[in-house]
A protein has these predicted regions:
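Rossmann-fold dinucleotide-binding core
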Residues: 61, 80-159
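Interdomain hinge/lid region at the active-site interface
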Residues: 196-263, 269-271
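NAD(P)+-binding Rossmann beta1-loop-alpha1 motif at the extreme N-terminus of oxidoreductases
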Residues: 1-48, 68, 72-73, 78-79, ...
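Hydrophobic beta-strand scaffold residues
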Residues: 12, 32, 93, 99-101, ...
């Protein structure tokens, strides 16, 4: 995302908890700040993308990044967090005269590299219109889904769907293998069937091979399903399939000694 902003000609100042992760951006022309506040204090637009709600609160509130933003600046958060946290950030921004969009992304590493991410946006239309040139450097679609919190709501729904699809294929694979049919035969049919999907086109071969390079880590998908279940409980919505999948992901996460892709949920049937 940062490299695409630089390619589009935007001046960029960055910070990362792990300095090595920022080195490609620095080599490409970005400036390195010593802390989040140092990024925010001169920014017209501040983009945050961190791993979980705790990290976002640490960056925005504990580090002082939010209070360092000047009046009239815009904060875009592309992390995946709860809608409630997005609304709390929006309220804190409003108190300081800062505009806010919750804009989590989908598209994975490939989409980020190609500049073809989809931003799921919650906030005001006029704010989205103003920052659209920045988003266009990183993505291809920016639907406005509603007020602040709507972007995070849709993102949690989408990731729940991805988690369920991969979990369902893992069960399918376990059944077919357990009944004595090679996985390769299943793949012949799967790839010509209506069961195909974008995520399974990528993840199913990984699951058959038992190789799980972390395009989207299991620990992050586990977090996102948990957030979806928490939102469902708050709203009185029953998610029986989501709850069952969460237990499966939880067991695999606790027993995995590496940091695998979420397609490693298939390990549940090999334990």
């Amino acid at each position: 995302m940062g490299l695409n902003l630089l390619k589009a000609g935007f001046p960029l100042t960055v910070w990362n908890r792990t300095k090595a992760k920022a080195e490609p951006l620095i080599a490409a022309g970005a400036k390195l700040a010593t802390d989040p506040r140092g990024v925010a204090e001169h920014a017209d637009i501040l983009i945050t993308i961190v791993s979980d709600p705790q990290a976002l609160e640490a960056v925005l509130f504990k580090s002082g990044a939010l209070v360092a933003l000047r009046q009239g600046a815009t904060l875009i958060d592309s992390s995946t967090v709860s809608p409630d946290l997005a609304r709390r950030v929006a309220a804190a921004c409003a108190e300081r005269g800062v505009d806010f969009l919750d804009a989590p992304v989908t598209g994975g590493t490939w989409g980020a590299q190609k500049g073809e991410l989809v931003f799921m946006v919650g906030g005001k239309a006029e704010v989205l219109e103003r920052v659209k040139p920045v988003l266009e450097a990183m993505g291809k679609k920016f639907p406005l889904l509603g007020p602040n919190g709507a972007g995070q709501t849709v993102k949690l729904g989408m990731n729940l769907l991805l988690a369920l699809q991969v979990d369902a294929f893992a069960e399918c694979l376990a059944l077919v293998r357990g009944a004595g049919v090679p996985a390769e035969k299943l793949m012949e049919v799967f790839q010509a069937s209506m069961a195909r999907s974008g995520v399974l086109d990528v993840k199913a071969p990984m699951m058959v091979k038992g190789e799980f390079p972390a395009s989207f880590p299991l620990r992050l998908m586990h977090k996102d399903v948990r957030l979806a279940l928490e939102l469902a409980r708050e709203r009185g919505v029953k998610l029986p399939a989501g709850a069952a999948a969460y237990e499966t992901y939880s067991e695999v996460l606790s027993s995995s000694k590496d940091d695998p892709d979420f397609s490693a949920v298939v390990r549940f049937w090999k334990q």
